[in-house]
Amino acid sequence: MVRLNHAASYFMPIFCSTRPHIVILSALFSISLFSLFYASSELLLHQYDDPLMFKPNSQDYFRTFLLGLFSPFLYYFLKTFLFNINQRFLILNLIVDFPINDVFMLLILIGLAYPQVQDHEGGTIKHKECSWHIIPRQAYIFGISWALGEFTICIIGNLFNYQEIADPNINSGFTHQESANTYCNNNDMSHNDDCGCSTEYRPNVVDRSDITLSKCIEVRNDSSSISNNVYSSEYHPIKPLRSSSSTYGSIRQQPHENKKQLHVPDNSQDDTIIMMNPIDNSLKLTTLDTGDLSFPIDEEQPILKKSFGYTWAVPNENTQNTTKSFTPIKRFIAFSTAYQLVTGLLLMILVVGSNIMLTIGESLILSMYFVYVRGHEGLFTPVVNYFGSRTISNFILCVIIPFISLNFLINTSIYLRRELDDWFNNSQGEFEDDDENTISKRVATNQEYQHPLSANYISMDSPDVINSSPGHFGMNSGQLLGNTTLYYGSLNGDDDDMTNDSALLRFCKKLVKNWRALARNDSFVLGVMVSWSLLVFVTGILSTVYI
């Protein structure tokens, strides 16, 4: 995705709510936020009071807006479709989203500063010297437009990655499933499959005496047949007596008129729409992430954990049927109070506003060298005059490389820990202290953990492992990835502070341990995010804008 996607959990729930007024309110607040930053650009100097300086007009600003808005789309296209970078590779995605993305932004800014010949007042004076030049207001608008493009990509790309569910403790609000159940209750009770409802929620739809094993097997075979669902153009479903399996995969309700005949082929299929369910269909073999779709949220009591300012429903590890794999669909509890809604809106403003300030500051810092024009030093700040009067290589070594590296390190320290927790622990919530008892319990409960990347994972209770020699544990690289002990550290905390380690190594271990503890807290993530964005924004303004 884009850089903002690493913090999407802080604001996507308000855009994925099932209540339209919350989504509309969120959209209005986000539009107002970007409009406020665009309006703030009027405070900057529109053009220099010098007849020989480049004076951008409305077309130049429109070109700046278009370059800033659509460049993230181009970068996203190259990243996703051309290079096909998988979201599973966390470190690689951080490298692509920050240092490489900053270099790409620098290239676009260089193209924006390309020399232009301009006719001056009266057409008598021509611009004799063509130089690379961009004014700070152009870089400012470019940064806002870039943030707007990233925000648009993030919203569109995550609309189906978040799902709102009802609070188990509060009988208010509707989820998607409850809405479907309500709709089905208002229609014919014998056609439950057309609305997406199951007998689990409406137990009195079909008499239990009519449910037989053969009918269940027939429904299962009919739904799992590729020939009936995909390749056959003359699909005639079979209608069992007093059963709704004949309408599987269809939104069309078909009456059962002939009750004496057990199977009646239906030949009127011209306007029938076949809808596939990859969970109970043979098409689940065509995707690597189908296991993630089998999250039995309605068949178990999920664990509720608070994080990112919301309450999340995560699979219950004590349930045997729980799928222990990374789940891209994050389920959050619906808003039940006005305070929760206001908190979500404030989080959205804080995170999105921080990203806008970060991109504005980056564009101002990266374009600092091209603001300078020789012979007009009195129009620029001392920082612009210092770096602009020197070579481009000096600017790259002293400003570009240190800034890009520092930006990558800080953002990695902000997001990496939370993403590792989401990936390996199947959770969006807070975790207990990593004491010996807790880790031992996690090792025992996650002994059969299978990571999506480990296709050849060998379970510890597998006969191959049990029959292996005492010196062979049968562990492969995929099993090591899912090993909770390796992720959390040694079972004995004293092993991390061995006396024979050097002082530097002990310091690094202690630093990493403190970072792991801090990076789990939302206050740390939001605090560092806002502080760094504000620092970059202020640095860019003071360095390029002559106050």
Swiss-Prot record:
Stretches of the chain found on the membrane's Cytoplasmic side: 1-19, 86-89, 161-340, 416-523
Record's compositionally biased regions (Polar residues) = 242-253
Give UniProt keywords alphabetically: Membrane, Phosphoprotein, Transmembrane, Transmembrane helix, Vacuole
Q: How does it sit in the membrane?
A: Multi-pass membrane protein
- Entry-annotated residues carrying Phosphoserine: S225
Entry GO CC:
fungal-type vacuole; fungal-type vacuole membrane
What segment(s) does the record annotate as region Disordered? Answer: 237-271
Chief localisation class? membrane
Q: What is this protein called?
A: Uncharacterized membrane protein YDL180W
Species annotation: Saccharomyces cerevisiae (strain ATCC 204508 / S288c) (Baker's yeast)
